Amino acid sequence: MTEVQEEKDYKLAIEAFNLVYNALDKKAREKFRSRARDMVEEIYTSGFIPTLFYIISKAGLENNNDKLTALLNSPSSKSIDLGSSDEASYMAYLFVILYYLSERNIINKEFLINKLKNNRLELIDKLYELSPIISARIKRYLMAIKRLAEALIEVR
């Protein structure tokens, strides 16, 4: 990866972190910090797709899909409240992944949002197809998210 790509990944990590930080309350931020610490490791032990399945299963999309799509569509998260539940922290981590994929043009944002709303299985199938590319490119970004969470979210 070139130095320019690395810088773009770090910049995207800061943007995504800022969006989820503002969309979560204090309790959910603490839970998100745990997700950021654990999920990056899980992706590289179990693989991207199995970990993604787990994250999706925990994100509560059946009740909160509109919040996730609003966050993906929004240039700012000021008016979006993901809540304080465990689901909110998983949804925030799912957002971080999907934000990277759309902003780095690995997957089209309109396709992503459409499939989140209408056909998650088709989205998962597309992500499975792209998983070798995703796995090779996303690690630095997720490590930056992890470090930001560790540095900026205090846990009692």
Curated annotation (Swiss-Prot):
Q: Which family does it belong to?
A: Belongs to the CRISPR system Cmr5 family.
Q: How does it assemble?
A: Part of the CMR ribonucleoprotein complex, consisting of crRNA plus Cmr1/Cmr2/Cmr3/Cmr4/Cmr5/Cmr6 at 1:1 and possibly 3 Cmr7 dimers. A Cmr2/Cmr3/Cmr7 subcomplex without crRNA can also be isolated. It does not cleave target RNA.
Q: What is this protein for, i.e. what is its function?
A: CRISPR (clustered regularly interspaced short palindromic repeat) is an adaptive immune system that provides protection against mobile genetic elements (viruses, transposable elements and conjugative plasmids). CRISPR clusters contain spacers, sequences complementary to antecedent mobile elements, and target invading nucleic acids. CRISPR clusters are transcribed and processed into CRISPR RNA (crRNA). The CMR complex degrades RNA complementary to the crRNA (target RNA) within UA dinucleotides, generating 3'-OH and 5'-phosphate ends.
Entry keyword Cytoplasm = yes
Example GO CC term: the record gives:
cytoplasm
Name a single GO biological process: defense response to virus
Cite the entry's keywords alphabetically.
Antiviral defense, Cytoplasm
Spell out the protein name for this chain. CRISPR system CMR subunit Cmr5
- The gene that this protein is the product of is cmr5
Where in or outside the cell is it found? Cytoplasm
The domain of life for this entry's organism is Archaea
Q: What is its main location?
A: cytoplasm
Asked if Cytoplasm is a keyword of the record, the answer is yes
